A protein has these predicted regions:
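Solvent-exposed alpha-helices and their adjacent loops that cap or buttress functional pockets
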Residues: 31-34, 41-43, 147-148, 174, ...
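Internal maturation/activation junctions in enzymes
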Residues: 1-43
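Short acidic, low-complexity intrinsically disordered linear motifs used
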Residues: 227-244
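Catalytic alpha/beta core of large soluble enzyme barrels
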Residues: 44, 51-230
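Conserved phosphate/anionic-ligand binding catalytic regions in large, soluble enzymes, centered on
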Residues: 1-2, 35-64, 240-243
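N-terminal hydrophobic or amphipathic segments with adjacent small-residue motifs
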Residues: 26, 40, 51, 232-233
Length: 244
């Protein structure tokens, strides 16, 4: 959504998916394994998009300027290191005395699409286009699970007068789009310390302006104890980790 003329062009998406399939097949042959049956999807990645300064996954930018929050446990050593320079960006997590919120001031890149630029149906039509041109084109074969596809994970921002249309659209295209979450368009005003917060009051603008971060040199960070919890990693579950 930060570069829609390229990233949402159907021909670009199809050609890109073909390149992914060909690359996967070439690498699979080189390392002696079977190529993937499905090679493409779209998933939101908050941390990476935060570092790159882009919107997350298929989603438009929340606003031209907004506050992005991140929750960390109080016992995480990198939090204490961060607070040495940027205590002004942190606040206690409401309802959880063992967690802290970090507030990041975000400004969308020029030309980026925001959620205010799209209707809910317009957003879902974009999801459908990417699902067909990128995700389904990236399917090399469906020999084992016919009809199953990866998906474009998404959260749709819905205005009060759009719910019926959204319901109808999702039902009509239920065989093509899945992984849809729905959020009221003003959801950031309904939830305390929401992940994305528009600047709707003078106080919000003042807060945003005060959140200017001080650069942190994390090369100086040292973790004295290993707090890794293997059960919390994505590849682990049920008390064990998958080894391939």
């Amino acid at each position: 959504m930060d570069n829609p003329k390229v990233c949402l062009d159907e021909e670009v998406l199809r050609k890109g998916a073909e390149v992914v399939k060909a690359t996967n097949a070439r690498i699979a042959k080189a390392i002696g394994t079977n190529p993937a049956a499905r090679t493409t999807c779209v998933k939101p990645e908050g941390t990476t998009s935060q570092l790159l300064g882009t919107s997350s996954g298929i989603h438009p930018q929340w606003d031209k300027r907004y506050i992005r929050t991140m929750t960390l446990n109080n016992d995480e050593p990198q939090l204490e290191f961060f607070k040495l320079w940027n205590a002004h960006m942190t606040e206690p997590k409401v309802g959880n005395p063992n967690a802290t919120i970090i507030n990041f001031p975000i400004e969308a890149s020029p030309g980026a699409i925001t959620r205010h630029d799209l209707t809910a149906i317009g957003f879902l039509q974009t999801v459908l286009k990417v699902q067909k041109a990128w995700v389904k084109t990236g399917c090399a074969h469906d020999d084992h699970t016919p009809g199953a596809h990866h998906n474009v994970s998404n959260t749709c921002s819905v205005r009060p007068d759009e719910w019926d249309q959204v319901e109808e659209f999702i039902w009509t295209w239920r065989r093509d789009i899945t992984g849809v979450s729905l959020l009221p368009h003003d959801g950031d005003q309904k939830y305390i310390q929401a992940p994305y917060q528009s600047l709707t009051t003078a106080e919000d603008v003042l807060k945003w302006n005060k959140l200017k971060p001080v650069p942190v040199d994390f090369t100086q960070f040292r973790e004295k104890t290993d707090n890794t919890m293997l059960k919390q990693t994505v590849a682990c579950g049920g008390g064990g980790c998958e080894v391939i």
